[in-house]
Amino acid sequence: MIKVNVLYFGAVREACDETPREEVEVQNGTDVGNLVDQLQQKYPRLRDHCQRVQMAVNQFIAPLSTVLGDGDEVAFIPQVAGG
């Protein structure tokens, strides 16, 4: 098992019970997509936002196939609207 730190911003934070960050324990070999699936089970309202976010691992935009390592920081980055 490894631990990753997950950060939530904006509407995603609201969907996650206003949790700004949390440490999540996952299996070795877990990728970002598996982590998102796990978090959607914990926070069902998160499903409504996952099509409109990008994921970052250690402050770099990362695909869902990115395998996580112990201590990684994973952030849900919501889209920004402009005008």
Curated annotation (Swiss-Prot):
Q: Name one GO biological process term.
A: Mo-molybdopterin cofactor biosynthetic process
Q: What are the protein's UniProt keywords?
A: Molybdenum cofactor biosynthesis, Nucleotide-binding
The scientific name of the source species is Mycobacterium tuberculosis (strain ATCC 25618 / H37Rv)
List the protein's name. Molybdopterin synthase sulfur carrier subunit
**Which family does the record claim for this protein?**
Belongs to the MoaD family.
| Pathway per the UniProt entry | Cofactor biosynthesis; molybdopterin biosynthesis
Q: Could you name the domain of life of the organism this protein comes from?
A: Bacteria
Q: Single GO molecular-function term?
A: nucleotide binding
What if the gene is knocked out?
Grows normally in liquid culture, traffics into host (human and mouse) acidified compartments early after phagocytosis, suggesting it no longer arrests phagosome maturation as well as wild-type, impaired growth in mouse macrophages.
